[in-house]
Every structure is written in C-alpha cells, then in structure tokens.
C-alpha cells in the first residue's frame, strides 16, 4: 500500500443488475447511482476534522487528475468513543478513526467537535479529490494522520453478502 492508512479501505459504489455504476452520460456525476446519496456515520464518535472546499473532480475515463490538492477531497474524520459515557469529553476518545472521503461539495452536515451517533447522516456521496468516479471511500485507521497512521480491519454488522447474478464468488 502506498498509504498505510488505506490498507483495509473500501470504495463503495452502487451497481445496477448489469454491474454498471452509471446510467446515461459517464462524464456527468449526476448519472452515477451513488452520487448524492446520504452518507451515515459508521459508529458513535466525535468529528475530529473536516474538509469542505473541494469541487467534484472531472471524470477522465477512469483516470485521476494528478493536480488534485488533497486526494481525499471533501471528507469527515471521526474519532470513535462511547457516547453513552457522559463523563467523557471529545479529548477522551480512543485511537480509532474513520475517514469518509470524496464527499459532495456543500453536503457536509457536521461540524468539528460535534458528537455523532452511528447511523446519523453526515454528508452526501460525491466525486471530490482523487477519484475516478463518484463513490464513498471508507477506512478505519489508528491515528489522526492520513499519511502516518496504520489502517485497521473493519467489522461490519448486519451485512448479507452473496453471489449476485453475473458475478462469481471467491474466497
């Protein structure tokens, strides 16, 4: 991995029954099924950092733009904590962070220092940053720094995954 924090990262798209992520014009973000969809907080935590000043990237036939200022684009970084513990302050949170990146311009609904609960809307899926098409980049890391943290395995709950028509399953 070029960036250690991305070791266990996922890129989420929405595909139709034929395996396509887009209908119509492939160079238009609005044509992608996931574009503009609500992004939810993956777990309880505190908003540690946000970036909101990136426009959506142009879609270059599956290539990224090398001149992008921040590969994450618009993003929310959450530091996870037990929100049921009313005694703790944001500074008492643990060392597990979630990064949600490539968010739609103007869609971030949370502020730095805000407490969030799992399932709470935080933004909308976009195509900002180093992105070949609209999608949600999601990773968990052991520190605040994108470049100097290690990626952590992600535990999903209530997910049923099975082979879809036209796809093969591999172990």
Segments (PLM) and residue ranges:
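Short alpha-helix capping/helix-loop boundary micro-motifs
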Residues: 31-34, 102-110
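Short glycine/proline-centered loop/turn elements that form peptide/ligand docking sites
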Residues: 109-111, 127-134
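Zn2+-dependent peptidoglycan hydrolase active-site motif and core
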Residues: 46-104
């Amino acid at each position: 991995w070029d960036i250690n924090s991305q070791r266990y990262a996922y890129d989420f798209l929405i595909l139709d029954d034929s395996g396509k992520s887009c209908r119509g014009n492939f160079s238009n973000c609005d044509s992608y099924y996931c574009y503009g969809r609500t992004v939810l907080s993956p777990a309880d935590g505190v908003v540690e950092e946000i970036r909101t000043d990136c426009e959506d990237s142009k879609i270059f036939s599956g290539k990224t733009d090398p001149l992008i200022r921040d590969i994450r684009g618009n993003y929310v970084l959450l530091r996870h904590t037990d929100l049921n513990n009313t005694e703790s302050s944001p500074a008492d949170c643990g060392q597990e962070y979630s990064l949600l990146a490539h968010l739609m311009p103007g869609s971030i609904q949370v502020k730095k220092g805000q407490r969030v609960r799992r399932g709470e809307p935080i933004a909308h899926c976009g195509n900002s940053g180093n992105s070949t098409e609209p999608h949600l980049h999601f990773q968990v890391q052991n520190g605040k720094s994108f470049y100097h943290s290690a990626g952590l395995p992600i535990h999903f709950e209530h997910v049923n995954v099975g082979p879809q028509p036209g796809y093969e399953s591999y172990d």
